[in-house]
């Protein structure tokens, strides 16, 4: 346990930030999974709607540094490619 006041504060901040990051990462994963679930069910309209929700979440969290910007771009690109392929089929 920290004895210095600033170290105690930093420990508290770490706990709060960790909890926030875990919640946000969970929200991100859920949004991406909804798109994948719609794609697996061959629901193009549902996949597009879920992608419209997931895309700004990916952008927002990559801007905040929760995930790397390239990972966000990769997710968006691959999901969009799958949606296009489903619509073409």
Curated annotation (Swiss-Prot):
UniProt keywords, alphabetically: Ribonucleoprotein, Ribosomal protein, RNA-binding, rRNA-binding
Molecular-function GO term, any one: structural constituent of ribosome
Keyword Iron: no
Protein family per UniProt: Belongs to the bacterial ribosomal protein bS20 family.
SUPFAM superfamilies reported in the protein's UniProt record: Ribosomal protein S20 (SSF46992)
Organism whose genome encodes this protein: Stenotrophomonas maltophilia (strain K279a)
One GO cellular component term: cytosol
NCBIfam families linked: S20
PANTHER family membership: 30S RIBOSOMAL PROTEIN S20, SMALL RIBOSOMAL SUBUNIT PROTEIN BS20C
Highest classification ranks of the organism: Bacteria, Pseudomonadati, Pseudomonadota, Gammaproteobacteria, Lysobacterales
Gene (name only): rpsT
Function statement: Binds directly to 16S ribosomal RNA.
Protein's name according to its UniProt entry: Small ribosomal subunit protein bS20
Transmembrane segments: none
Taxonomy, superkingdom: Bacteria
């Amino acid at each position: 346990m920290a004895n210095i006041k600033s170290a105690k504060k930093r420990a508290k901040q770490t706990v709060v930030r960790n909890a926030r990051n875990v919640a946000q990462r969970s929200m991100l994963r859920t949004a991406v999974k909804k798109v994948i679930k719609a794609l697996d069910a061959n629901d193009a309209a549902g996949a597009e709607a879920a992608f419209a929700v997931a895309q700004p979440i990916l952008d927002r969290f990559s801007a905040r540094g929760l995930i790397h910007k390239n990972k966000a771009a990769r997710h968006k690109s691959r999901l969009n490619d799958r949606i296009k392929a489903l619509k073409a089929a």
